[in-house]
């Protein structure tokens, strides 16, 4: 093996870095080096005239970025719970996520995973605690060894934006690399695996991480082409053209220009025998507008999001059941993404617990992620539904607190602790009854 194995691993990421830059240009055209985003930009055959360049720039828009935002903003991890009765401090388990600022940075992590097909989270020792560092696919080179579907890679290298290696991760050590490419510090983590978690929402059974942008590039190109055609009509053929036939030859170029100027500015036109005036109608845009809506609807359907989330159209006279049905595909899509992202997130927390010598937490596979409910429901609707669950089905009200929109599991736990510390008079009396040990109140002696 080479004395500098990270160099070969970094070289192998060059194509991935270029692809990531191309996806960024597809998300927000014009945000990176001109010419990178050729697949979406050449909607008119790559014309060079000023008018063509201007119309091309107007046609390109951040439609894919809006789509990724629509999905990414609805994926919020609020905490973890256990599905079995095990001992352990959930606050300590969740603390590395909080220390890394991930409650506010997680949306960027999920959006990077959706855009590039995968994003990464490094779990590293930081004194007595664990530290989490997120990185996009453009800044990480990974070797999966013989199993591309494994939870942990065989080794990994972290890069600068320019592609220079800065950190080499093995199953035992974190090796820091200076600007000359030489190692200068090694930190032993001793986990037995390279602590780099991969968040891949569309990971195939063979380990291929598909990108949402790559999946939707063709329908997005179709939509942009339709928008470009509409702009061409608006720019060139959206007004009536006046015509005149039978005019005498003016005789000179100056007279011809003078007559042309007169005809173009006069509101009342007159002519001699045989002169006929008319007009050519403007090109109708109805068909291209219908095509634009159809292309946007196709793009939304392929992304499993409601079409109105991309078009901004208003919803009129939709019942609650119809609205829920319209959003069912999006909800199923987000649920599948949450399932895919939940396992690597829990792996990161278990690795953090192992670094912090919390053996019980590190071996706890009963954990599950609490994902925030981001459905657009009013508080009155939620209260009515939860009240019916409690009264009609006998579900304890305290267990429904965390299902209230906007209430996190941590807040629900605080409510439970407060309720335990401040019982109602009836609950206090019931506790006094059971304090005797026989279920009867104590007898006062006279």
Which residue ranges define each predicted feature?
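Extended, helix-rich architectural segments
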Residues: 1-132, 441-446
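Charge-rich, acidic-biased intrinsically disordered regions
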Residues: 37-44, 126-129, 247-261, 348-381
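C-terminal amphipathic alpha-helical
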Residues: 105-113, 121-122, 284-380, 388-390
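Extended, regular secondary-structure scaffolds
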Residues: 115, 120-210
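Extended, charged amphipathic alpha-helical segments
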Residues: 185-325
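Long, compositionally biased
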Residues: 235, 241, 327-346, 352, ...
